[in-house]
Amino acid sequence: MAEHNLLGKAGEDAAVDYLERHDYVIRHRNWRKGHFELDIVAAKNGELIIVEVKTRSDTDFALPQDAVTPQKIRRTVIAADTYIKLFQIDEPVRFDIITVIGKTGNFRIEHIKEAFYPPLF
């Protein structure tokens, strides 16, 4: 596996650990349907939380959350809609971003709640 892929997996693992420490229940990781993927699907307090994880070794070039473009938001919302319909979920939905910066074992994590809202298509 390429080094950037290893960093990404370590970042997702760190994000899951963070969420579990904060009493989130992880429903799925890397859930896929067709071409769509959700990094983490979690639940807490009767709410479904869709989490996009962005991992970077540093912020010299840009902030990790800057990689969540309007196109990425659109794809995430479509994937979430597919997930909700497939599993017949009737709960409020929230879209979060977790940024993971640093090296494995020494990550800095930021949880951005309600990072974006579903756009109108």
From Swiss-Prot:
InterPro entries: Restrct_endonuc-II-like (IPR011335), tRNA_endonuc-like_dom_sf (IPR011856), UPF0102_YraN-like (IPR003509). HAMAP family: UPF0102 (MF_00048). Pfam families: UPF0102 (PF02021). Belongs to the UPF0102 family. It comes from Bacteroides fragilis (strain ATCC 25285 / DSM 2151 / CCUG 4856 / JCM 11019 / LMG 10263 / NCTC 9343 / Onslow / VPI 2553 / EN-2). One of its GO terms (molecular function) is nucleic acid binding. This is UPF0102 protein BF0634. The lineage of its organism: Bacteria, Pseudomonadati, Bacteroidota, Bacteroidia, Bacteroidales. It comes from the Bacteria.
